[in-house]
């Protein structure tokens, strides 16, 4: 078993919380895990991404080469497109349908969504609405997205749930 995941979004959307929960879930399931993250201008709504590699065999690099990612899990639709060159043929894009329009030249939303919907393996959900309805707060949309991506990540649900709980134990 080996799953290469690219987590993508913008600052404040909880990408690093997803990474922490997935990492905890993998380790508690006796899997190997390597992770690299970039969050330079994240506090100003900039790009945040994490490369996460999970395997039942030792992993020697935390980087994911272009064309090799099994899944792009994105909390923001434009960020899903940004990392498309990393997706392998047959890989899945799992993204939130709600854009975070924080730049003046943000692409036209209809064009963006049409491009995503044209992909052969995609799951597009309105995570913000689901989070607001289920948890009472759109800030939970990151974990809604993690749940949407869970069928493509070979970690049992109970470990994912424990991974989320581990993040919030100290809060």
Predicted feature descriptions by range:
Residues 1-171:
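Active-site cofactor/cluster-binding pocket
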